[in-house]
A protein has these predicted regions:
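Short carbohydrate-recognition loop motifs
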Residues: 41-65
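Extracellular polysaccharide-targeting segments
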Residues: 1-38, 147-201
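Beta-strand acidic-aromatic groove motif in beta-rich domains, primarily in extracellular
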Residues: 91-104, 143-144
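Secreted extracellular polysaccharide-interacting domains
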Residues: 56-75, 107-116, 145-147
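Extracellular carbohydrate recognition and processing domains
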Residues: 107-140
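Surface-exposed coil/turn segments at beta-strand junctions on protein surfaces, enriched
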Residues: 61, 75-77, 123-125, 135-139, ...
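Extra-cytoplasmic beta-strand recognition segments
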Residues: 33, 59, 64-97, 130-134, ...
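Extracellular beta-strand ligand-recognition surfaces/modules
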Residues: 98, 129-160
Length: 201
């Protein structure tokens, strides 16, 4: 098993081959514009005019729970990281927060399920990236999502990213997104995309 040792003045962390990102591509599809039919609860969100830090479309919603997600087959022994850009409108929320949730149809949940990631009262003015690294207890189809437990605060969501490994990668397209765009890519770029897809497929 491959291991990388990160030296730090305070601690030493060993990264195994399951925690090192092996692909820069998103496991979620259609995240630049919320396209496709894989999204859950997308009908509860409205399109807004904000542009994300990566130049993508965003969606907004005032309401608790019902986080944006897609059903994904995840495996035991693999480490995953989910991240997103969020913009929290001005609020006076006290103890409410954005957390991460993940479960399958049989009630199995991800590690650190329901973990608070950002208390709304502490949210800065502008976009901020939230992220969470997790594992799953069983090989199954999971719905991983960020959610707020406050039904009175409007939140904008964008740049959803799910990648393998313990490091939150910058937002990127999925392989399915790139494959769907190959027909519209200029000839001079097709070889680059084709080689890239072959290397990581």
């Amino acid at each position: 098993m491959m291991q990388l040792i990160l030296n730090d003045a305070k601690k030493q962390k060993v990264l195994t081959d399951s925690s090192v990102p092996i692909s820069p591509y998103n496991l979620f599809d259609g995240t630049s514009d919320f396209s496709g039919t894989s999204w859950t609860t997308l009908d509860l969100y409205t399109n807004d005019k904000l542009v994300s830090p990566f130049g993508n479309q965003s969606r907004q919603r005032k309401g608790a729970w019902m986080g944006l997600s897609q059903l994904k087959d995840l495996k035991v022994g693999q480490i995953y990281t989910i991240s997103a850009s969020v913009f929290v409108d001005t609020n006076d929320s006290s103890d409410k927060f954005i957390g991460v949730y993940g479960d399958d149809s049989k009630g199995n949940v991800i590690s650190s399920n329901n973990k608070p990631l950002l208390y709304l009262k502490n949210a800065p003015v502008g976009w901020i990236t939230i992220k969470h690294t997790f594992t799953v207890p069983k090989n199954a189809t999971y719905k991983i999502r960020f959610e707020s437990n406050d039904d009175q605060v409007n939140i904008h969501w964008a740049d959803l990213m799910l990648n393998k490994g313990a490091v939150a990668l910058d937002w990127n397209y999925s392989l399915n997104d790139l494959r769907s765009r190959l027909g519209g890519v200029k000839p001079s770029y097709r070889l680059y995309y084709a080689i890239s897809l072959k290397e990581v497929a």
